[in-house]
Amino acid sequence: MPAAKHASLNRRTLGIGVINYAYYLAKNGVRYSDGSANGLTHRTFEALQFYLMKASANLAQEQGACPYFHETTYSQGIMPTDTYKKELDAVCDEPLHLDWDGLREQIREHGMRNSTLTALMPSETSSQISNATNGIEPPRGLISIKASKDGILKQVVPEMDRLRNQYEL
């Protein structure tokens, strides 16, 4: 455990994810398969990453960067907007909406409090507890049966009656 504690304190890694994304898309009347969700998805995840990085940079400004910040690509001024697969531009031509160059300069000057911020996982347990759809995945059905060590759980997608035809299964 000392090695894990050492890494945790020096990297200050987080794993912030997303649940209920299928509900978010259904509520906004867009779909995974026809491209109508692409712009909304771009804007949402740009904001998620930007504001998480901004908050971490603000914390670094107040409390100092994580000790291993120098080992991250962020310390070299490399941002997610520099490393994404450019082939995605053919799928979604949404421009960047936030001040990434300003954030890059803040991070160069003050660092970040956390070396990692996001982890987009299925989030099965969190979704069950919140009666939300799993992570960023479409639901398998409007109603699903899930087994756990605590028994059988019937889970219904949020607002099933109203959004029944908006969910993409």
Which residues fall in each region the model found?
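Long, C-terminal-biased catalytic regions of enzyme "large/alpha" subunits
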Residues: M1-L169
